[in-house]
Amino acid sequence: MPTIQQLVRFERQTSEKKTKSPALKSCPQRRGVCTRVYTTTPKKPNSALRKVARVRLTSGFEVTAYIPGIGHNIQEHSVVLIRGGRVKDLPGCRYHVVRGSLDASGVKDRKQGRSKYGGKRPKGD
């Protein structure tokens, strides 16, 4: 434990928190242009073809972003909105594409959790 004199000479250092999504630069979302759209396989023990996009952001970063939902219309040169949020079984994928905004369309025929996928309200209700 430091003495009062030591505290006068050297103040306590506050530990700086490291952000989990540095490419957003403290913004809730960022716009970017897709440079490559492809599928990749998850870590063990999972097995799938996960849809991801390489996106060049307005902040200057180029990141890998996951495209959630069933089916998408994103292709190269599509302008998309990116939010934070990693995909646990895809190493290096720390961002999500926001469905239903800019060039990314919402998921069709989605009944539940529509707000997360930009789905339109069904006609029957």
Curated annotation (Swiss-Prot):
Its main location: plastid. It holds the Pfam family Ribosom_S12_S23. The keyword Ribosomal protein applies. Transmembrane segments: none annotated. One of its GO terms (biological process) is translation. The keyword rRNA-binding applies. Keywords: Chloroplast, Plastid, Ribonucleoprotein, Ribosomal protein, RNA-binding, rRNA-binding. Residues 113-125 have a biased composition (Basic residues). It comes from the Eukaryota. InterPro entries: NA-bd_OB-fold, Ribosomal_uS12, Ribosomal_uS12_bac. Residues 104-125 are annotated as: Disordered. Part of the 30S ribosomal subunit. With S4 and S5 plays an important role in translational accuracy. Located at the interface of the 30S and 50S subunits. This is Small ribosomal subunit protein uS12c. The lineage of its organism: Eukaryota, Haptista, Haptophyta, Prymnesiophyceae, Isochrysidales.
